[in-house]
Amino acid sequence: MPKIGVEHSLTSVQEALKAKGYEVIPLRGENDAKGCDCCVITGQDANVMGIQNTVTAGSVIEASGLTAEEICQKVEEKLR
């Protein structure tokens, strides 16, 4: 199952992704994103934890204004 990095403040997103069977990695620092297939961030900081510095080869999804279910759909789309 793909590894999904989720910013630690997005607990509802973490729970929703776990319920769908994904391995969820809480993102607290730059190194947490390494090895993740996709990362979900709050978008409060455009360059949160240096993720935009290509720490991860996976997609980065900004959660701003989206529900947990909408984010799960975006994750599934990115992983196809």
Swiss-Prot record:
It comes from the Bacteria. Disulfide bonds: none annotated. It holds the Pfam family UPF0180. InterPro entries: UPF0180 (IPR005370). NCBIfam families: PRK03094.1. Belongs to the UPF0180 family. This is UPF0180 protein GWCH70_0946. It comes from Geobacillus sp. (strain WCH70).
